[in-house]
Amino acid sequence: MSPQTETKASVGFKAGVKEYKLTYYTPEYQTKDTDILAAFRVTPQPGVPPEEAGAAVAAESSTGTWTTVWTDGLTSLDRYKGRCYRIERVVGEKDQYIAYVAYPLDLFEEGSVTNMFTSIVGNVFGFKALRALRLEDLRIPPAYVKTFQGPPHGIQVERDKLNKYGRPLLGCTIKPKLGLSAKNYGRAVYECLRGGLDFTKDDENVNSQPFMRWRDRFLFCAEALYKAQAETGEIKGHYLNATAGTCEEMIKRAVFARELGVPIVMHDYLTGGFTANTSLAHYCRDNGLLLHIHRAMHAVIDRQKNHGIHFRVLAKALRMSGGDHIHSGTVVGKLEGERDITLGFVDLLRDDFVEQDRSRGIYFTQDWVSLPGVLPVASGGIHVWHMPALTEIFGDDSVLQFGGGTLGHPWGNAPGAVANRVALEACVKARNEGRDLAQEGNEIIREACKWSPELAAACEVWKEIVFNFAAVDVLDK
């Protein structure tokens, strides 16, 4: 017998496998203000008790492994282990439970969303004892929040930079998303901006392809927005997508955007990755650039109700990693988004303090302390008839983004932009006068059509376009 084995034997080490719940299920545990708290939707395999499943999640996402190891004796498990401290049965669902897990803050590197997710949603999601696992929510303690820079600038600073107050901002994604030359792309940008939009946008998959290299696109878009600014007297922006195959190339593109003097760049934060996103957010803070975030790939992760990560968690992670805008769904458009759930994570993006509210899917009270807020972006299948609902749902601190709803106007891009701006101004005016946008929305739009032929034409084109599909991800009953 080796000296090491003799030493461990003397303190009671016993090799073998024991149930996770004996170590990691601790219903008596009182959570600390510094703990990261997680709510998991757990679907155990047949025959696996919920307590064992919840404890397995806590173990495999913190200090545990499948067998007892002698090196456990070289550290303090009580200090570092995750703890499943509560389990609730999901009403109306067979064999589904919400397992609450507390993680000590010392498990995580400061200022790193990458490290946080590597632990909490790493290998545990492939664990055989679970049929499915979904991370529903996280509580990020103020002590950890303060290690992040967060959004480069935030809502108020953006409004001050743009000199735009008292209404939602208007945007448009240039279509077709792929295939235009840089010059034709810039022309479309110019027409939309001179028509009254605040922003135009690269689509998420516009990077640097053979038909339009990034440097050419940046130059023509900068020319377009400066020309539109000179004609309208308003500050304009175009989301120049800096996403690239390497972090070095991404930063190079952001540097060129700064040299052109444009106000905003863009990043695909899930496909690009949190490390790249945080790096770009830090560059934008240091160099006065706003940062628009697209959530391409999110539905692969968040759409299924029993497995993956809920978007409210991805939204919190983005606020920590850094971004001034993020796409959030529309409630009324073509993309998934149930109203109460959407409004729940919109508040988590914008507000400083959000109370627990299970009716909106918010499992934990979240205090963001001094972290700036993020503007939610409503985009996807929306048009002028949706304007009253969007204004009522999202309020002033939002970006309403009409791609096809601008470029599909029968008279062209600029009239499409005019129609959207007129519809927005009419809705804001009506709201400020005390009218009910939810009840009187269609009437408000029809009244505005009388003095805007561009809006009237848009209303005629899209009068019968609806997307009546039930949401897949809905609140538990």
UniProtKB/Swiss-Prot annotation:
The record marks 334 as: Transition state stabilizer. Binds 1 Mg(2+) ion per subunit. It catalyses: 2 (2R)-3-phosphoglycerate + 2 H(+) = D-ribulose 1,5-bisphosphate + CO2 + H2O; D-ribulose 1,5-bisphosphate + O2 = 2-phosphoglycolate + (2R)-3-phosphoglycerate + 2 H(+). One of its GO terms (biological process) is photorespiration. It is an enzyme of class 4 (lyase). InterPro entries: RuBisCO, RuBisCo_large_chain_AS, RuBisCO_lsu_C, RuBisCO_lsu_C_sf, RuBisCO_lsu_fd_N, RuBisCO_lsu_N_sf, RuBisCO_lsuI. It is found in: Plastid, Chloroplast. Substrate binds at residues 123, 173, 177, 295, 327, 379. Keywords: Acetylation, Calvin cycle, Carbon dioxide fixation, Chloroplast, Disulfide bond, Lyase, Magnesium, Metal-binding, Methylation, Monooxygenase, Oxidoreductase, Photorespiration, Photosynthesis, Plastid. Its EC number is 4.1.1.39. Its main location: plastid. The disulfide bond which can form between Cys-247 in the large chain dimeric partners within the hexadecamer appears to be associated with oxidative stress and protein turnover. The disulfide bonds reported in 3RUB and 4RUB may be the result of oxidation during crystallization. Mg(2+) binds at residues 201, 203-204. The modification N-acetylproline is found at residue 3. The modification N6-carboxylysine is found at residue 201. GO terms for molecular function: magnesium ion binding; monooxygenase activity; ribulose-bisphosphate carboxylase activity. Its cofactor is Mg(2+). The keyword Disulfide bond applies. One of its GO terms (cellular component) is chloroplast. Heterohexadecamer of 8 large chains and 8 small chains; disulfide-linked. The disulfide link is formed within the large subunit homodimers. Belongs to the RuBisCO large chain family. Type I subfamily. The basic functional RuBisCO is composed of a large chain homodimer in a 'head-to-tail' conformation. In form I RuBisCO this homodimer is arranged in a barrel-like tetramer with the small subunits forming a tetrameric 'cap' on each end of the 'barrel'. RuBisCO catalyzes two reactions: the carboxylation of D-ribulose 1,5-bisphosphate, the primary event in carbon dioxide fixation, as well as the oxidative fragmentation of the pentose substrate in the photorespiration process. Both reactions occur simultaneously and in competition at the same active site. This is Ribulose bisphosphate carboxylase large chain. The lineage of its organism: Eukaryota, Viridiplantae, Streptophyta, Embryophyta, Tracheophyta.
